[in-house]
Amino acid sequence: MLDERYRTLLEARSRRPQTIAEAAARRVRPSSLFNEHGRLMMIAADHPARGALRAGERALAMADRTELLDRLSLALSRPGVNGVLGTPDILEDLLLLGALENKVVVGSMNRGGLAGTVFEIDDRFTAYDAASLAAAGFEGGKMLLRIDPDDPSTVATVEACGRAVSELAAHRLLAMVEP
């Protein structure tokens, strides 16, 4: 059975989707990208969007949405953890749960290259774009850049990543490129 926090979250998403933008506008942003030790310690929460649900020995560790959100909220509350990287659905849920206050928030941008598919390297930007990250008041965007010298789709992904870095820079946002 869902606890009250998740019933409220589902109600907001289904009946009042504008509350996501309202919560983003109210969110207290961090004063720096770095924690008190001069480091950026982020929790990565963009793996489920590619169907990667394993954590350790648990093949479906990230399959239960409420358990995942509980674990992410707990991790974000730990000393020294000052940020999260995630897809729109995860970040919006964490935002509605109040877990992103004073946290560095980086949105995942390209999630189209699903593992094991013929279009895996043709990794389209199917999540955030720079304008939506700026509108949400998030600190940056992250993209995955995989190079396959035998796949002609690589060049389109390289070009799209370059364009995304420029668009993030135009909005004065952090760009993270994962090799």
In which residue ranges do the predicted regions lie?
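Histidine/lysine/aspartate-rich catalytic loop segments that bind and position anionic ligands
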Residues: 169-179
